[in-house]
Swiss-Prot record:
Species of provenance: Bacillus cereus (strain B4264)
Entry protein name: Putative cysteine ligase BshC
Alphabetically ordered keywords of this record: Coiled coil, Ligase
Entry's family note: Belongs to the BshC family.
GO molecular function term, any single one: ligase activity
Length: 538
């Protein structure tokens, strides 16, 4: 593997944050300097965490996942007051979801290792599975290349319900059939059978979406020391109840902190992305087997548009009696993460970084400092045949990342033709239009009743001109079919659907192409944290 870095233009909060713009950096409590990480350690040492209870739960959970010894040792290390975590999170996507989930894990593993060495303290990697999430449309699909198109392949659950991913049962046989259909779109390789067995072994141990995700991630990163946590696990929820109570007692201040921070963001010229109802309590409650967001209504906590109503005392009692009924929303999830883990750094994608910039005053409301927020590593893989296509078309490796591939294709095609087709036909259409306008005036002058017919005549002529243009372009494209297919392959591989590769392709494609140790070999590379995009030639 050969790794290269390229500067890809970014926009909004992420671009300004990475470029060191002070105005947006003031929306975060720590800069990304070594001194700031030392200050973070100092601040964490002044807080108390329920380490032993957390260790007991994480040991049980990761042992059930058959995690490696290095993971279990890292869990035990969390019992020491001088151990800290680098953390990231994601929904439990089928087959682990898009590649960026894998890249988040790689990011926390690398940063944890680096900070352990530079700060001289134990730093362990933790991945927070958003098991409470109930938006199945976000996790029930993957993309494949089929019939010369990128297609979204959805797993249709037989019994869909608005339950969390941790509680949504997975039909193993149906999912197995869905996975087999996906693998049929991949080339048959020496690794295909092993990868299918690898995936099926994880599937057979799974009852829910989160189970399947957790087993796969555990197997892919078997020797890395990665700790997994299911944010909706009932045993973890018991440990979180004191903080749920704090949120309930301060929900108005939380909402006010969010609104005030969003005003700051607006004044800086950015558009807030967190949308909440004005009376939101920012906590979900399970009602009739569905996650329902609680709202404040005249001093009562209500759900389902007032169909269910609780007093403060009733809600607190229910939390103590049945903690598994409660979960966080987008605003309180980062707060709960901060409550549970001694977080040295949080790693997030561009969208997460933007929405965390809206949470600073929310953190302060509950007495926390926002942890250092580190943008995750971004990676694209370039297979050998794609590198050859780029070379054959005389494109630079950076071209597909800095330009629209369709535009590159159009420019290349126009360069193969002495005179631009579009320009020639536009000129012809204009000249014909001028002639026909004069002709229509003459016809109307002689016989006004033929005016409408003359207009239709012009339309028919234009239709024929456009037909000729399409036929000419089709013939030219057929002439350069080999080269244009290279552009199509480049688009599918590097910018599928016009998006970054890591937002569309799934890791199973690369495991199938390069073997089960593919991710291990990727992690042997050294990555920088300067915001540049990492291009890995395979």
């Amino acid at each position: 593997m050969e790794i290269k870095e390229i500067s890809v233009p970014q926009q909004g909060v992420v671009a300004d944050y990475m470029n060191g713009k002070k105005e947006i950096q003031s929306c975060f409590d720590y800069m990304l300097t070594e001194d700031a990480f030392k200050q973070r350690l100092h601040d964490l040492r002044e807080r108390e965490f329920f380490r032993q209870d957390l260790v007991a739960h994480l040991l049980e959970y990761n042992t059930k996942l058959q995690a490696g010894e290095s993971t279990l040792q890292n869990v035990k290390a969390l019992g020491d007051e001088n151990t800290y975590v680098v953390i990231a999170g994601q929904q439990a996507g089928l087959l682990t979801g898009p590649l960026y989930t894998i890249h988040k894990v790689i990011s926390i593993l690398q940063l944890a290792k680096e900070k352990e060495e530079s700060l001289g303290v134990k730093v362990v990697p933790v991945f927070w599975i958003a098991g409470e999430d109930h938006d199945m449309d976000e996790i029930n699909h993957t993309f494949v290349a089929k019939n010369k198109k990128m297609k979204k392949t959805i797993f249709y659950d037989r019994n869909p319900k608005k339950a969390s991913a941790s509680e949504s049962e997975l039909s193993v046989e149906d999912c197995r059939n869905w996975i087999e259909e996906i693998f049929k779109t991949y080339p048959e390789t020496n690794f295909t059978k092993d990868v299918l067995k690898f995936v099926d072994d994880a599937l057979k141990k799974s009852n829910t979406y989160v189970d399947f995700f957790a087993h796969l991630i555990t197997k892919i990163f078997a020797n890395s020391g990665l700790i997994l946590v299911d944010s909706h696990h009932p045993e973890l929820r018991k440990l979180e109840i004191p903080f749920f109570k704090r949120i309930i007692s301060k929900y108005k201040e939380v909402q006010e902190g969010l609104r005030n921070q969003q005003e700051v963001i607006k004044e800086l010229g950015y558009k807030p992305i967190i949308e909440t109802k004005s009376h939101a309590v920012h906590i979900f409650m399970e009602i009739d087997n569905e996650r329902v967001l609680l709202e404040d209504q005249q001093g009562k906590f209500v759900g389902k548009d007032g169909a269910h109503s609780f007093s403060y005392e009733e809600l607190i009692e229910e939390m103590e009696r049945n903690p598994a009924r409660f979960s966080n929303n987008v605003v309180t999830r980062p707060l709960m993460q901060e409550y549970v883990f001694p977080t040295l750094a949080f790693i997030g994608g561009p969208g997460e970084l933007a929405y965390w910039s809206e949470l600073q005053q929310v953190f302060h409301t509950v007495g926390f400092q926002m942890p250092p927020v580190v943008p995750r590593l971004t990676i694209t893989y370039v297979e050998r045949d794609i590198a050859t296509d780029l070379f054959d078309l005389q494109l630079r490796e950076s071209d597909p990342f800095l330009n629209d591939v369709d535009k590159l294709r159009e420019n290349w095609l126009s360069n193969q033709i002495e005179e631009p087709i579009d320009d020639h036909f536009e000129k012809a259409k204009k000249e014909i239009a001028d002639i026909h306008t004069s002709l229509q005036r003459f016809v109307k002058k002689i016989e006004p009743g033929l005016g409408a017919f003359a207009g239709k005549n012009e339309l028919k002529i234009n239709e024929q001109i456009e037909l000729l243009e399409r036929m000419l372009k089709r013939n030219v494209e057929k002439k350069y079919e080999v080269q244009l297919n290279k552009f199509r392959r480049i688009q599918f591989a590097l910018r599928p659907l016009g998006a970054p590769q890591e937002r569309v392709w799934n890791v199973c494609y690369y495991l199938n192409q390069f073997g089960l140790d593919f991710v291990d070999r990727v992690m042997e590379n050294s990555f920088s944290w300067d915001g540049k995009h990492h291009v890995i030639k395979l």
